[in-house]
Design a protein with these regions (language model features):
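Internal, well-ordered alpha/beta segment that forms a basic, Gly-enriched binding/recognition surface
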Residues: 144-156, 185-186, 194-195
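Flexible, glycine-/basic-rich loop-and-beta segments that form/coincide
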Residues: 239-297
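Short catalytic/ligand-binding loop motif for oxyanion handling, primarily in non-cytosolic enzymes
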Residues: 86, 152-156, 202-207, 255-256
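C-terminal target-recognition/interaction regions appended to catalytic cores
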Residues: 299-407
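Class I S-adenosyl-L-methionine
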Residues: 1-115, 125, 130, 371, ...
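Conserved Class I SAM-dependent methyltransferase catalytic core
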Residues: 173-232, 246
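Mobile active-site "lid"/loop adjacent to the S-adenosyl-L-methionine
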Residues: 152-175
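Short amphipathic alpha-helix with an adjacent loop that forms part of the alpha/beta core around
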Residues: 128-141
Length: 407
């Protein structure tokens, strides 16, 4: 059992941060206090103001204790908000570390300064003029960066009207996502360790990994746990995405993570599930996901495919040519029909939300004709009138999809 952290009620009414076992259920914490209520919706989106559940701060504390963090270490949270991670200083073994906090949310920093007087605080943009001296950190001091940096895709269609794509960021760390830019900033600061929360998609989606490659190529993943974004206050209950609490250790240049290694990596969730990307086949490896120039007869159109969470929000077969229309090769129609059925019938765990659509390739012939019949019945505006669904099709398809998810 981890050591009990102190209760801090100054400025946050009735917030209890209790010690928890590494596998214990969540406790009442900062998310129940609505502590970002001073921010508008746009402010919460742009600042990434979704604060960290206490049990993950506890987990990071355990990792740092095991590393032997001491007075020669600087523990910095450069997007600290109200300072949830500075409860680390109440751990006896970590009390001697030097603590630095920073956030551009001046209201949050003002309150954090009252709650954690032993921490040196700044209100600077951590993504501009990135260097240790900006925060008074010596070049030779061992640095561990902790926290829950903002992760908002400034190009996303979701909340598009409230996101600010013009936040100042150094050119050499600029990406389409502030969280990715934050990781690149930590690499630029040459942090010895990085213990932060970020979307699992940074690791598992190849485009995201490549955008953040300068960080990952210099760090190895030494500990982690995955949980649902639904644990954050103010987030959607409809489509939780996987968040990883990760401990990275700086290694020799070019000796860090590769995406091929990530695909083989065995990930663990807070609920005790384990999975790897290479543990699944993906139907999207057999079909076109994005618009292309090929044309077929008959013309069948499908909406652009991304991950499973995006599939839940988007259409599948469409009757009109739009910029997001994918022309379907008739020979591969069963695969597209399977995606349509997967959207309709799959009940996937949150940790699969950023996956491509999985299937079992060697067993697909069992349902090939069934998914075509089912998709035709449910998309008659595209395929024409179908009198009845094929008997038993839905049950067989559901059973197959359940088998895929348990695979």
């Amino acid at each position: 059992m981890a050591r009990r952290l102190t209760r801090r009620e100054h400025g946050i009414a009735a917030v209890v941060v209790a010690a928890v076992d590494s596998d214990a259920p969540a406790v009442k914490d900062l998310k129940s206090a609505n502590i970002s209520s001073h921010l508008s919706v746009s402010g919460r989106v742009n600042l990434g103001s979704f604060y960290t559940p206490a049990r993950y701060v506890e987990r990071v504390a355990g990792w740092l204790r095991n590393l032997g963090a001491n007075r020669d270490w600087c523990v910095a949270d450069l997007s600290c908000g109200y300072g949830a991670f500075f409860e680390l200083a109440d751990c006896r073994e970590l009390a001697a570390c030097r603590y630095i906090g920073n956030d551009i949310d001046t209201v949050a920093v003002a309150r954090a300064r009252e709650m954690f007087p032993g921490v040196r605080f700044y209100t600077k943009n951590a993504l501009v003029d990135v260097k240790r001296g900006k925060f008074g950190i010596e070049k030779r001091r061992r640095l561990v960066i902790v926290g829950n940096p903002p992760y908002n895709d400034v190009t996303s269609q979701i909340n598009q009207g409230v996101k600010d794509a013009n936040l100042p960021v150094d050119e050499d760390i600029r990406t389409r996502d502030l969280g990715m830019s934050s990781l690149l900033a930590y690499n630029k600061l040459r942090a010895d360790y990085v213990a932060v929360l970020h979307p699992l998609s940074y690791l598992i989606k190849k485009a995201n990994f490549n955008a953040t490659k300068r960080f990952f190529s210099n760090y190895e993943l030494v500990n982690h746990v995955i949980f649902s974004s639904q644990e954050f206050a103010g987030t959607s209950r409809l489509a939780g995405f996987p968040v990883i609490v990760a401990l990275y250790r700086r290694t020799q240049t070019g000796r860090g993570l590769t995406h091929e290694a990530v695909k083989d990596f065995r990930f663990r969730t807070i609920e005790g599930d384990e999975f790897s990307l290479n543990g699944f086949d993906y139907v999207t490896d057999y079909i076109e996901k994005y618009p292309h120039k090929k044309r077929y007869r008959p013309e069948i159109l499908f909406y652009t495919m991304r991950d499973i969470n995006a599939l839940k929000r988007s259409r599948t077969f469409i009757g009109e040519r739009i910029p997001n229309a994918v022309d379907v090769d008739p020979e591969k129609l069963p695969y597209y029909c399977y995606v349509d059925c997967f959207k309709r019938y799959a009940n996937v765990p949150y940790w699969m939300g950023n996956f491509n659509v999985p299937f079992i390739s060697e067993d697909f012939d069992e349902i090939r004709d069934l998914v075509v019949a089912d998709a035709r019945f449910h998309n008659q505006e595209v395929f024409g009138r179908v009198r009845n669904a094929r008997r038993g099709a839905e049950l067989a398809i559901r059973n197959y999809i359940d088998r895929v998810i348990r695979h």
